[in-house]
From Swiss-Prot:
Molecular function per GO: aminoacyl-tRNA deacylase activity; ATP binding; leucine-tRNA ligase activity
GO cellular component: cytosol
Main location: cytoplasm
Motif 'KMSKS' region, chain ranges: 576-580
Entry-linked InterPro entries: aa-tRNA-synth_Ia, Leu-tRNA-ligase, Leu_tRNA-synth_edit, M/V/L/I-tRNA-synth_anticd-bd, Methionyl/Leucyl_tRNA_Synth, Rossmann-like_a/b/a_fold, tRNAsynth_Ia_anticodon-bd, Val/Leu/Ile-tRNA-synth_edit
Protein name, as recorded: Leucine--tRNA ligase
Protein family according to the UniProt entry: Belongs to the class-I aminoacyl-tRNA synthetase family.
Pfam families linked to this entry: Anticodon_1 (PF08264), tRNA-synt_1 (PF00133), tRNA-synt_1_2 (PF13603), tRNA-synt_1g (PF09334)
């Protein structure tokens, strides 16, 4: 009987669906394992082989944990609101809902054809009113807690798309060729900054890649500094700046404020006013990225005003420059060009003084010195001296002096800004707020507030969403009076902030999630997705989760206990897959050619899961040959009879099998799937070479392989007489004695260089290892005439001699 992947994969996918094989159990006595994908946006281009990598990894873990006796929750859904469907609607007039439904159907079919063991009864869609009812409910809870507010915000406006972009979205849109400018707009904003400290501290509680944690730390950007008041000459007020280096105050030679600073025009003297206004207008046309880029040429304009340095009484010129942002600190900085590269470049361009106040190894007029490791110089007045002090001591002494003089105060600041939450588009969750004629706002009482049908999807010329044109939906009256509904909708991030909770209890119409179910399943044990979401989805989800924790809706402080970022699979040309490059490999094509099991195995065998690696279609053919070898362990293709026997395997085969159990188990637990597969290949080769068709070894192999290649293993499992699914088979346990080599190869090094090897029995004592190593002929000559300073023996692995010539 030949291996026909197409027939048997369809057979088992249909049976799994009919029998709901992978539905999570309601039994809360079993240990749970919640494994989750970052659910996809269902685009019109469909899934390619790169998309399948993360989904395959989570499915392997789901199947592996089921075999280990866990109650597994492994769901799938759709992050289906978003701009692409709306842009398609603008071009074609097709309702975004229809486009989304079509795309979802395509994605679902591909995922099912991969044999992923999702519990499809828990499928969610962020555009479903029964789902976004609870997204709106969370928003209203944020509003009640004062964490959602309206503000006139300078936003990133994309003229072509007629939409506001979050700061985190700007880079991508510019890269796609869109123009992004700054303009003020009435916006809903979420006060994520209220949770900045907790978002920072609780990173220590989760098992995440360190680079992702660091990206979030940098994005939150906690800094300890001092706010210092500089008295403005000719103005009866102060200019407050924020600095993390009060120890350099004596070296400040000018101040800089942002173009949006409320005092920008007020500080301009008559002769400078025209230039100042012109500069402010030019700054509005730039994005923050364009303004703050390190390679950007420094620009600025002098206001004509001066402020007094509280440390030495000097009058410092006040400049305006777009590299300073109002959103960070106070929107004003003191510039110490000798010890800050950006300030140094600005000073050089505009001929401003440069004064050394940190002892430098070179002339600061020629090169900046920004090291904290040196000590202060030229930093004293009649009341205080910090000369000779290190950074920390000088910081504390200067801060204390400024506070005692009423000229400053210690302050913790964050780069993190409140989250601009509203979008001027149709295809998003309506914000459930009513604006009354008396200026008050009240929440919608009947959720969900659904989207009305519209004739055109273009944003209005005023920047409002198309909802502003639907008067029958827009205006209403209730017991509080006449009202106008909010026309902004939520960003795509809203629905993905909490979807992991809805998977736990997707049909609940009375609560976001049942408390007992939430307490059993949370938090997510393993979350796999791309690192590109480090400061977007992951940060937003953590914020919402902490709000829900404070509300008593969830029982954990963090949503995702373990995070793993898969590496990107590149095209065969070693470039990122994209339509423009023509290097996209559609998932459906390779599935029809090679089958799901081969694709799953090849995706995982390409290399370490976390690494970037190129696709090679020829490589998958080797995987197909491996699967045929597995098939032939059970079936004789010539006689169409089974080969399986009840014979006891030889001692050598048993040892090989238990080594494989140990290696595959350990590697799977650590998501080292490529080496787990390699170990199974070694086992299959051994069984084939020795002609071992023992039921014991074959069934063990099938269970080990089942998370990786579920269709072929399910078929062969049933062929061997089992009536229950292999997904419920017990994961094999290795015998430590059999999994250990009797004889080991020991490496011998001299001064860290390999000079020979010898064989020794397992458990060989360190002293015996050292003596045996000295007798190795190729080693002895490197010890001759040498004094052995140190002898190191690592049991079962190596011996190293540290030597030096004898005196």
């Amino acid at each position: 009987m030949k291996y026909d992947f197409s027939a048997l994969e369809k057979k088992w996918q249909a049976r799994w669906a009919d029998e709901q094989t992978f539905a999570s159990s309601a039994d809360q006595d079993k240990p749970k394992y919640y494994v989750l994908d970052m659910f996809p946006y269902p685009s019109g281009s469909g899934l390619h082989v790169g998309h399948l990598e993360g989904y395959t990894a989570t499915d392997i873990m789901a199947r592996y944990k089921r075999c280990q006796g866990h109650n597994v929750l492994h769901p799938m859904g759709w992050d289906a609101f978003g701009l692409p469907a709306e842009q398609f609607a603008i071009k074609t007039g097709t309702h975004p809902r229809l486009t989304t439904e079509k795309n979802v159907a395509s994605f679902r079919e591909t995922l099912k054809s991969m044999g992923f063991s999702y519990d499809w009864s828990r499928e969610v869609n962020t555009t479903d009113p029964n789902y976004f009812k609870w997204t709106q409910w969370i928003f209203l809870k944020l509003y009640e807690k004062g964490l959602a507010y309206i503000s006139e915000v300078d936003v990133n406006w994309c003229e072509e798309l007629k939409v506001v972009l979050a700061n985190e979205e700007v880079d991508e849109k510019i890269a796609d060729g869109y123009t992004v400018v700054r303009r003020p707009l009435r916006q809903w904003v979420l006060k994520i900054t209220a949770y900045a400290e907790r978002l920072l501290e609780d990173l220590d509680e989760v098992d995440w890649p360190e680079n992702v944690k660091q990206m979030q730390r940098n994005w939150i950007g906690r800094s300890e500094g001092v706010e210092i008041d500089f008295e403005l000459r000719c103005h009866r007020t102060n200019l407050r700046v924020y600095t993390t280096r009060p120890d350099t105050l004596f070296g400040a030679t000018y101040l800089v404020i942002s173009p949006e600073h409320p005092m920008a025009e007020k500080l301009a003297i008559a002769q400078q006013l025209v230039e100042v206004k012109k500069y402010i207008e030019q700054a509005k046309l730039k994005t923050e990225l364009e303004r703050t880029g390190l390679q950007k040429e420094k620009t600025g304009v002098f206001t004509g005003s001066y402020a007094i340095n509280p440390a030495n009484g000097e009058a410092l010129p006040v400049w305006i420059s777009d590299f300073v942002l109002t959103s960070y600190g106070t929107g004003a900085i003191m510039s110490v060009p000798a010890h800050d590269s950006r300030d140094w470049e600005f000073a050089k361009k505009f001929g401003l003084p440069i004064r050394e106040v940190i002892k430098s190894p070179h002339d600061v007029q020629e090169e900046v010195f920004d090291g904290k490791e040196s000590v202060c110089v030229n930093s004293a007045n009649d009341e205080i001296s910090i000369d000779g002090l290190d950074f920390k001591t000088a910081f504390d002494r200067m801060a204390t002096w400024l506070e005692s003089k009423g000229k400053g105060k210690r302050k913790v600041n964050y780069k993190l800004r409140d989250w601009v939450f509203s979008r001027q588009r149709y295809w998003g969750e309506p914000i459930p707020i009513k604006h009354y004629e008396d200026g008050t706002m009240r929440p919608e009482t009947n959720l969900p507030l659904t989207l009305p049908e519209v004739e055109a999807y273009h944003p209005t010329s005023t920047g409002e969403s198309p909802l502003a044109n639907i008067e029958s939906w827009l205006y209403g009256e209730d017991e509080h009076g006449k009202f106008r509904r909010e026309t902004n909708t939520m960003p795509q991030w809203a629905g993905s902030c909490w979807y992991y909770l809805r998977f736990i209890d997707p049909q609940n119409g009375n609560a976001l999630v049942d408390p007992s179910r939430e307490q059993y399943w949370m938090n997510v044990d393993l979350y796999i997705g791309g690192a590109e979401h480090a400061v977007l989805h992951l940060l937003y989800s953590r914020f919402w989760h902490k709000v829900l924790y404070d509300l008593g809706v969830v029982s954990t402080k963090e949503p995702f206990q373990r995070l793993f970022n898969q590496g990107m699979i590149l095209g065969e040309d070693n470039e990122k897959m994209s339509k423009s490059r023509g290097n996209v490999i559609p998932a459906d094509h390779v599935l029809s050619t090679y089958g799901a099991d081969a694709v799953r195995l090849y995706e995982m065998f390409l290399g370490p899961l976390e690494q970037v690696k190129p696709w090679n279609t020829h490589g998958i053919e080797g995987i197909s040959r491996f699967l045929n070898k597995v098939w032939r362990l059970v079936w004789d293709e010539n006689t169409e009879t089974q080969k399986t026997t009840d014979d006891k395997p030889s001692e050598a085969v048993l040892k090989r099998m238990h080594k494989a159990i140990k290696k595959v188990t350990e590697d799977t637990e650590q998501l080292k799937f490529n080496t787990a597969i390699s170990e199974m290949m070694v086992l299959v080769n051994e069984l084939t070479k020795t002609g071992c068709y023992s039921r014991e070894t074959t069934e063990t192999l099938l269970v080990l392989l089942s998370p990786f290649a579920p269709h072929i293993t399910e078929e062969l499992w049933q062929t061997l007489g089992h009536t229950e699914s292999i997904s419920g088979a017990v994961w094999p346990v290795f015998d430590a004695k059999l999994a250990t080599d009797d004889v080991l190869t020991i490496a011998v090094q001299v001064n860290g260089k390999l000079r020979g090897t010898f064989e020794a029995p397992a458990g060989y004592a360190k002293e015996d290892m050292i003596e045996s190593a000295k007798k190795v002929e190729s080693v002895a000559k490197f010890l001759e005439g040498q004094q052995i300073i140190k002898e190191i023996a690592v049991p079962g692995k190596l011996v190293n001699f540290a030597v030096k010539p004898q005196q």
